[in-house]
Amino acid sequence: MPTNKIRTRFAPSPTGYMHVGNLRTALYAYLMAKHEDGTFILRIEDTDQGRYVEGAVDVIYNTMRETGLLWDEGPDIGGLVGPYVQSERMGMFKQYAEQLVAEGKAYYCFCSEERLEALHAEQRANGEMTHYDGCCRDLSAEEVRKHLEAGDPYVIRQKIPRTGVTGFDDVVYGHIEVNNSEMDDQILIKTDGMPTYNFANVVDDHLMGITHVIRGSEYLSSTPKYNLLYQAFGWEIPTYIHCPPVMKDAQNKLSKRNGDASYQDLVAKGYLTEAILNYICLLGWSPKGEYAEQEIFSLPELVKVWSPEGISKSPAIFDPLKLRAINAEYLRRLSPEEFLAKAEPWIDQAVHTPIDKKLLCANLQPRCEVLGEIPEQLDFFDAMPEYDVSLYANKKQKTTPESAKEALEALLPVLSDEALDFTNRDAVFDACKAKAEELGKKNGWLLYPLGIALSGKQRTPGGGTDLACVMGREKTLERVKAAIEKLNG
């Protein structure tokens, strides 16, 4: 289908969760299309039924929608070149393979599994790379006819040239050449009549008018075979953009099979969708020019600044700390109302007694990096944990258990004053500050013990007066009195 517009596609296999590397490929394909006012296509490649996972197609749809990577053509909305589910396109692939056979560019191979296993075993024993030896490559038309009439099982193989070089240009990796003698006669149609992944990929990309193929660098080695197929059919070769792998560390790739991070895992841990997408884009890509130092980008901003020349050849290592930092920045940029809406489900996991959630969130927002860590920070609200009075000792605040008892006893009448409005954080702080000044002490000497008395922890989302306002007068007084009793020992 001739087109003057850029057409990209994301063609996932429904094999489970959306892996970080897959989501990055989808994002880059989306950005490539949208930056050039082109068309972004979603195609489901479900021909490998052995790896098919029930419900995985819905995971793909949901992830793409949640992240805003909305497609212009796809299985659910259709388009001019459907169907967009590969298993629904099965009838055409064998026809194209047989066209190549008729033109002498592919051939029927009747070798049995047993023969191929023996061949590969011998090659391994000789220290060779396993490959097909071309046994059926030059069968006569009569020999082929006899095999077909006998109903012998067969595959259709691509007839790779034995001499010469196949080269291609990649936007990221530059010009690459491979000796044809190093390439195997790859299978196009399997014994069950189904196309192989590589063959279906080429045919579908051509028929759907894909102009730019964006995929992982693991497909670099297959690209010369792809190009020989395009040439065999006389089709235009697309622009290739191969992306570096996403690594867990210097030695290991992130992998769905090894249980590494998927988009769904990160959301379940409390990362924001926008932050995940932003971070994933920076895994192996960086903006140029005036945006070179910028790290926080909305999806529309990424569309604006996108350039495939920003993709690195080097593997990208998934850095959880960097993701945390970007997520924290997104949380800080939320309005108080937006933060409350996102934090409330996590607060409700830990707190089942009445508290001022709005005030709590005002304390949480500047401190929170990942929403999923909120519950463990709030486990003291429902019930006071056991703690040792040694927690009251703090060199910086110049407090001891003895001074803490004195401080809490001084605070008790301040916090008991019915005129003190616990919904006004500044008023409560100012009242406590005035008491510290009256005693000739620094604020921390008075307020550090209050925080311990209310939480039983050294680190909390907010200081002592913050916690008092969130808990309310009744619970605050109850815990301060209990702390004094504990310190009386």
Residue ranges of predicted features:
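Structural motif
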Residues: V20, L266-E274, K313-D319, H352-L360, ...
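Active-site cores that bind ATP or allylic diphosphates and position pyrophosphate for catalysis
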Residues: A102, Y107-H242, K248-L254, S262
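N-terminal Rossmann-like or analogous alpha/beta NTP/dinucleotide-binding catalytic cores
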Residues: P2-A125, S222-W235, A275
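Charged substrate- and nucleic-acid-binding regions of tRNA-handling and nucleotidyl-transfer enzymes
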Residues: D426-N488
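Glycine-rich phosphate/pyrophosphate-binding loops
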Residues: K34-D46, F199-H212, F233-M247, T460-D466, ...
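Small-residue-rich helix-loop
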Residues: P336-L439
